[in-house]
Amino acid sequence: MFYWILLALAIVAEITGTLSMKWASVGNGNAGYILMLVMITLSYIFLSFAVKKIALGVAYALWEGIGILFITVFSVLLFDEVLSTMKIVGLLTLIVGIVLIKSGTRKPGKPVKEATRATI
């Protein structure tokens, strides 16, 4: 569970860092770029710890996929970016992919021990 929390922190840091890049580019100067640098760095640090117990492909796909989803939503809400029909279809496809990837990470059940046979 701890490593999933680290992955969630990596995702939040990535979203914050990427949004601060846009924030800096629309006129808020160096503070946005400094925040971007710090948050993207933290994001990779958290991700590097998360992949100690979460498969790299799964962690990276969730990190990037969930990040893109929330960055797009916040870009529409905060920066008045346009959400076209194609973007909506892409986001829905992304959500389906995230669900499929996450459902494929369930731990297998404990192996059943073979009954020991009595020797005659």
From Swiss-Prot:
Name of encoding gene: mdtJ
Cellular component aspect of the GO annotation: plasma membrane
Any one Gene Ontology molecular-function term assigned to this protein's record: amino-acid betaine transmembrane transporter activity
Transmembrane stretches, start-end: 1-21, 31-51, 54-74, 81-101
Protein name (database record): Spermidine export protein MdtJ
Record keywords: Cell inner membrane, Cell membrane, Membrane, Transmembrane, Transmembrane helix, Transport
Location(s) in or outside the cell: Cell inner membrane
Transcription regulation listed as a keyword: no
Ranges in coiled-coil conformation: none
Transit peptide listed as a keyword: no
Alphabetized HAMAP family for the sequence: MdtJ (MF_01598)
Subunit: Forms a complex with MdtI.
Gene3D superfamilies: 1.10.3730.20
Family: Belongs to the drug/metabolite transporter (DMT) superfamily. Small multidrug resistance (SMR) (TC 2.A.7.1) family. MdtJ subfamily.
Function: Catalyzes the excretion of spermidine.
Protein's membrane topology: Multi-pass membrane protein
Listed InterPro entries: Small_drug/metabolite_transptr, Small_multidrug_res, Spermidine_export_MdtJ
A biological-process GO annotation: glycine betaine transport
